[in-house]
Amino acid sequence: MATNVTVHNATCFSQALTEDFWDGVKLSFTVSIVIGLVIGGIIWTLVTCLSRRRASASISPRMPKSSSRRPRSSSHNHALNRSGFYRNSSCERRSNLSLASLTFQRQTSQEQTDPFTRKPSFRASTFHPFMQCPPLAVEADSQLVTLPRSNNTSPTANNTVNLSRPDFHWSNNSLRLGPSTQTPPPAYDSIIKAFPDS
């Protein structure tokens, strides 16, 4: 009898314990879900309010149209004026350099004109700032032949001053200093006609 009573009490206690346990689990689960939803709702409302305030703060303070356009246009004009100044100065420098090179080319081409009124040679038509045209020396049958150079003055300089320059002649791998009263070399076609074999 006593054993049956104890077994019956144990089963009743276990049943009551299991029912109470599951009821507590269900209650705690629902309470935790409710608390989580409440906390999440509060956080969501705070975030949305802060984002709306930031967005409205960046958009709402608008200046009048006339006052907002004036500083922009003045700064834009100032930047354009600066860029225009630099462009003008660079264009002036380039134009000055191109004019100087054109005058040098005209002087050299007019100084070395062809007496036969033919097309000037490549050396006479282009400007070589660091080249001084020595007279053309041609060896024919082991004899040194130099073409004469005329003393032409530049048309831009209105005086007849002859600037004597030493002329160099090459013969048998040796450098010789010659007189300065020789003419510039003629055009390439006349040289070929003068020396057809070479």
Curated annotation (Swiss-Prot):
UniProt entry tagged with the keyword Nucleus: yes
Renumbered ranges of motif Bipartite nuclear localization signal: 52-72
Compartment annotation: Nucleus
The entry's keywords: Nucleus
Region spans: Disordered: 58-83, 172-198
Disulfide bonds: none
InterPro entries: Myc_target_1 (IPR029180)
GO annotations of cellular component type: nucleus
Keyword Nucleus appears in the UniProt entry: yes
Role, per record: May regulate certain MYC target genes, MYC seems to be a direct upstream transcriptional activator.
Recorded family membership: Belongs to the MYCT1 family.
Name listed for the protein in its UniProt record: Myc target protein 1 homolog
Taxonomic source organism: Xenopus tropicalis
